[in-house]
């Protein structure tokens, strides 16, 4: 059923565009535009652990935060026909960026609202992040000064982090928050990677007045497939956790404003907000010290939200 639904979603722009105008479709291979921009990426990504044997309550959460990572972003769009456009876009970080990670556990089932263990890692790096997007648009309105259309596409994004050093407050079996200390500076504590794969649908449009232009895009997916990999490097607790979550929700809103410095060239600024909401999924672990493994259904949660700001140049050939 989901495969049939997805097929309908992906063909929607083509079907609508074929009925949106009574004019004959014409092939316009020369109508291509490309843009390039520089900007920053900020946000937070979260991983959660749940215990099914305790009613699925949350027992652990790691928050990975990053701010103002430099990125380069680009896109190319081809108006294949007046009613149909295809495009490709993507961005990548230009280098690693400092961040912060907080790891909290709630191990006391009799007091589930109070954390028992916490570690803080201000020496955290966003190693890299990137994204690519392939899409097709069907234009319901396509006039020289305004456009409005439906879109569908496929998008993937990746994030990688490493936390080093830091401090901790743990609870022993006999006490509560009674074990306080720090990790060696520069020593790897945890490495974490997230990946999101999603087909999506959306709405996009723009409006031009003289040399000024405003545009916006909304995207939604209910078919996100998220996966992650968590490496605990502590020699006494060398464990790899892997999780997979299906059918998460994704929302994205993008707004841009630009000015045409020539008939074909536009400078612009843009802001984009993205969010993948939390949902439970399956997780597995492998203990490297004693060579044992375990699997838990609905034992993990994955979440991500970020904000991108860019400034760039768009040129129509």
Swiss-Prot record:
Pfam families: Omptin (PF01278)
Record: active site: 103, 105, 230, 232
Record's signal peptide: 1-20
Gene Ontology cellular component list: cell outer membrane
One of the record's GO molecular function terms: aspartic-type endopeptidase activity
Subcellular location: Cell outer membrane
Primary location class: membrane
Entry's EC annotation: 3.4.23.49
Topological category with respect to the lipid bilayer: Multi-pass membrane protein
Topological domains, Periplasmic: 21-31, 79-83, 141-145, 210-211, 262-264, 317
Gene3D superfamilies linked: OMPT-like
InterPro entries referenced in this protein's UniProt entry, alphabetically: OM_adhesin/peptidase_omptin, OMP_A26_sf, Peptidase_A26_CS, Peptidase_A26_omptin
Purpose: Protease that can cleave T7 RNA polymerase, ferric enterobactin receptor protein (FEP), antimicrobial peptide protamine and other proteins. This protease has a specificity for paired basic residues.
Record-given protein name: Protease 7
Organism field: Escherichia coli O157:H7
